[in-house]
Each structure stands twice: as C-alpha cells, then as structure tokens.
Amino acid sequence: MKKIRIGSRDSKLAIIQSEMVMAAIREFDPDIELELITMKTTGDKILDKTLDKIGGKGLFVKELDYALYNNEVDITVHSYKDMPLEDNPKLPVVALSKREDPRDAFVLPQGEIAENNEPIGSSSQRRQLQLKALFPNRKTAPIRGNVQTRLKKLDSGEFSAIVLAAAGIKRLGLESRISRYFSVDEILPAASQGIIAVQGRAGENFDFLKLFHSEESLCISQAERTFVREMNGGCSTPIAAYATIVESEIILKGLYHNEATGESKKECVSGSRQNPVELGYELVKKMESCRRI
C-alpha cells in the first residue's frame, strides 16, 4: 500500500487546508495511506516583528522545505500567497487548488458596531497602503500571528478592526466574523490569494493530486506572480496583482507603490490565457514610469 506523508504548519487553518488536499487524494485512491505531519515554522514563532524585518515569506516554508529535502515528508501544503516568489527547481509546486474567495475582509471586535480610536490591524504593506486610501482618517498598524491569534488581539481591544484574507476566514468556519468584504477594486489582493499550493520533490510522481489541481489557478498565478516578482515585490513593498480568466483571455490588474517618490499606480492589461507569463511582463512594462526614482 502506498503511503504519503503530508507536511503542514501546525496552525488550525494550515491543518484544514492540508485536510482538503488529503480529501482529494482519498478521492483519487482510497487505498493510499495518509499521514499528516505538522511543524512550527520560523514565521510562526517570531511574532513581535514584521516579516520584512526577519527575512520575508520564506520563513513560512523553511522548515517544511527541510522536511522535504530530508525525506521526512512527501509533499507540503501552503497558502500560495505566503510562498516566496522565486521558484525552487528542486522543490517545485506540483498542484494548486481552485481559487477560493480572493478578497480581503474587514473584521470588527465581537459585539462592536461603532468605530473606536485604535488602529486597523493589517499584516502587509499592500493592505496598509490601500486602507489609507479608503480610510484616510484612520491609523493602521501591523499585526502578526495566525487567524485565531489576530482575532484575540482584536477582541481584547488592541485594534479597532483587522483585515484578513476572506478565504482563510471561510475555511475556518468564521465567516460570521466578517463585517464587510472589500472588492478587488478597493483592495487589490496579494498574488495567488485564495489558492492552496502543494510542493514536492522534483522528478517524483504526483498523479495522486490530479483531482486537486486546477489549471486555471496555475494560469492566473503565473501572470500575478510574474508581475509581483519582476517588480521586486517582497513583504516590504506595497504591490498587488489579481488576474481573472474570461473565456480565452486573462485580465491582469496590478498595483505598485514607489516608496521613494510616494507615487502609487494601478494598471490593467489583457491577453491570451495561453501566455500568462508574458502578460505579467507586459504589466511590468506599463508600470515602468512609476518604478523610476
């Protein structure tokens, strides 16, 4: 009997997402034995600093990558938006989920209907930039931790509201906590937001993930991540990308903020869904004027 060991962060959301992958594997072949192996990543342990101060998104995958390299697990499961933008040829992304809700959500303290004077909590420069445009008279402040940790900070009075990815809240069954959804025009999402990624070792067989994988998610992620990567969009850079497929076309929207000049720019391009990477580069070219100092 074939056995597959699945590596995951140990947060409740990460485990739920891993269980979604496991359900698809069982549907493909009920005889495959599955083992879930959870671990804390460096990004989960260091919560008193923003990600750009401690090494970026790679801190959420480092321990899981080591487990793959050392053959302690066979695949690992991630929120794709939290993965580094540079591909690792030895540990490729081998499957992507269908995209769930890509929007960001506004969450108020439990029982709260009126605004208070505390800041709006947000984990990314991307969100903070767009929140300032939506709420020019409100302060924003960084917030770290898993969803439950952030909700506790919110409910204890540290923040007047927080902004989280809608997909994660829904997967946790906490949709009732959402006060409002921001449209993708109000807050443009992070590249690959709402998509779960599965990583494995190069050269191995991953047919067991056929029922999980979405070619549409691969297409839109290639466009979004190409744009963000080429614009040097790490955790400290306010940058966003969102692609949709309409019939045979991809529509790609992007946001870039030049911190040196203070200029922000939104642009949109469209093209054949057969060429998502090229479309990402096309959007980069449209942003060139904003990137110059």
From Swiss-Prot:
SUPFAM superfamilies for the chain: Periplasmic binding protein-like II, Porphobilinogen deaminase (hydroxymethylbilane synthase), C-terminal domain
Gene Ontology MF annotations: hydroxymethylbilane synthase activity
Cofactor notes: Binds 1 dipyrromethane group covalently.
EC number(s) from the headed UniProt entry: 2.5.1.61
InterPro entries, A to Z: HemC (IPR000860), Porphobilin_deaminase_cofac_BS (IPR022419), Porphobilin_deaminase_N (IPR022417), Porphobilinogen_deaminase_C (IPR022418), Porphobilinogen_deaminase_C_sf (IPR036803)
Pfam assignment, any one: Porphobil_deamC
Catalyzed reactions: 4 porphobilinogen + H2O = hydroxymethylbilane + 4 NH4(+)
Protein keywords: Porphyrin biosynthesis, Transferase
Pathway in which this enzyme or protein is active: Porphyrin-containing compound metabolism; protoporphyrin-IX biosynthesis; coproporphyrinogen-III from 5-aminolevulinate: step 2/4
Keyword presence, Transferase: yes
Stored Gene3D superfamilies: Periplasmic binding protein-like II (3.40.190.10), Porphobilinogen deaminase, C-terminal domain (3.30.160.40)
Required cofactor(s): dipyrromethane
Endoplasmic reticulum found in the keyword field: no
Miscellaneous comment text of the record: The porphobilinogen subunits are added to the dipyrromethane group.
Annotated family: Belongs to the HMBS family.
Protein's job: Tetrapolymerization of the monopyrrole PBG into the hydroxymethylbilane pre-uroporphyrinogen in several discrete steps.
Subunit structure: Monomer.
Protein's name according to its UniProt entry: Porphobilinogen deaminase
